[in-house]
Amino acid sequence: MMSETIITTPHVVKLISNFFQKKLFSSISTAYPLVIITDVSVQQHLLGPILDHIKMLGYQVIVLTFPPGEPNKTWETFISLQYQLVDQNISPKSSIIGIGGGTVLDMTGFLAATYCRGLPLYLIPTTITAMVDTSIGGKNGINLRGIKNRLGTFYLPKEVWMCPQFLSTLPREEWYHGIAEAIKHGFIADAYLWEFLNSHSKMLFSSSQILHEFIKRNCQIKAAIVAEDPYDRSLRKILNFGHSIAHAIETLAKGTVNHGQAVSVGMMIETRISLAEGVMKTPQLIDQLERLLKRFNLPSTLKDLQSIVPEHLHNSLYSPENIIYTLGYDKKNLSQHELKMIMIEHLGRAAPFNGTYCASPNMEILYDILWSECHVMRHC
């Protein structure tokens, strides 16, 4: 496989064996500087050969970097990068390429959408999370005053180029974090993917064929949802399953919990809410979800995050009141006092709720489930 186009709508996604293909860059003009956005970790470990190849093709390349990690996906980083684009006098006809994980792609997408009202955008994801989730669908965001993705836009890339070889540089834990989003895709929309993950959990790390099928299936699931609802008004909301709780965890834990870990716990809690609300009728699905998460060394309870979150943040995180207050900032809400949440109907199907795909949880049920999670922690 040199290059396989696995998605054409809402934007092109190509699965490639390497980047040393001249035709890959054929749609990008050499008449204007090519801007690359990445973090310092990717710059040190992956960027060199790609940069040499791009320069060999005749491009003038400007590389802008920022420190890695979610805590740096901030307004301050965004403005600093915008200033650098202005200082370099980057033309509106220049293309911008984001190379990295979810944080880099979020930041690059927001930069591309806002600089000169839009630069041609290309994305090169280097992590599982970025390949199966962040790079698909054109949604981007940065954090503001510690609130997850408070600022953002919908801005589609021209193309996304995925090279699974990049994943060989990742520690196994990074793979696991990305697989949380894949488990979500199976849970809300595709029972086949769910069974695929159950059947191929070990081969995923050793078989390139299985890995390619895994990436392809996830991209196609998300792309189909986005194509039907590009602006997050109805069906696309189901992609937020597990994320209401997850974003509250990430906010209260001050970025010390990885997004995949937070989504993993968020899915478990929101599944319990779905059952308690009577939306889901199969209690065994909770155990099935937990077993699959554990197979990939993912947490399933707030208690599982105890060793990750610094002790001085425990009182903040392990408080039902704090979690509910932080849920008030979730973008699905109609107001801070009218929470909205995605719920599961059965395996492979999120509850439609008459086409809104989200509903207000019973606050007593929500509090009781959060209290049971936090109460265990307070008595450890």
Swiss-Prot record:
Binding site for Zn(2+): E181, H243, H259
Subcellular location: Cytoplasm
Keyword Nucleotide-binding among UniProt keywords: yes
Annotated cofactor note: Binds 1 divalent metal cation per subunit. Can use either Co(2+) or Zn(2+).
Positions of NAD(+) binding: 68-73, 102-106, 126-127, 139, 148
InterPro entries: Dehydroquinate_synthase, DHQ_synth_AroB, DHQ_synth_fam, DHQS/DOIS_N, DHQS_C
Pathway: Metabolic intermediate biosynthesis; chorismate biosynthesis; chorismate from D-erythrose 4-phosphate and phosphoenolpyruvate: step 2/7
Keyword entries, A-Z: Amino-acid biosynthesis, Aromatic amino acid biosynthesis, Cobalt, Cytoplasm, Lyase, Metal-binding, NAD, Nucleotide-binding, Zinc
GO biological process: amino acid biosynthetic process; aromatic amino acid family biosynthetic process; chorismate biosynthetic process
Catalytic activity: 7-phospho-2-dehydro-3-deoxy-D-arabino-heptonate = 3-dehydroquinate + phosphate
Pfam families associated with the record: DHQ_synthase (PF01761), DHQS_C (PF24621)
Top-level taxon of origin: Bacteria
NCBIfam families linked to this entry: aroB
The protein's role, per its UniProt record: Catalyzes the conversion of 3-deoxy-D-arabino-heptulosonate 7-phosphate (DAHP) to dehydroquinate (DHQ).
Stated family: Belongs to the sugar phosphate cyclases superfamily. Dehydroquinate synthase family.
Name used for this protein in its record: 3-dehydroquinate synthase
Species, as recorded: Chlamydia pneumoniae
Encoding gene, per UniProt annotation: aroB
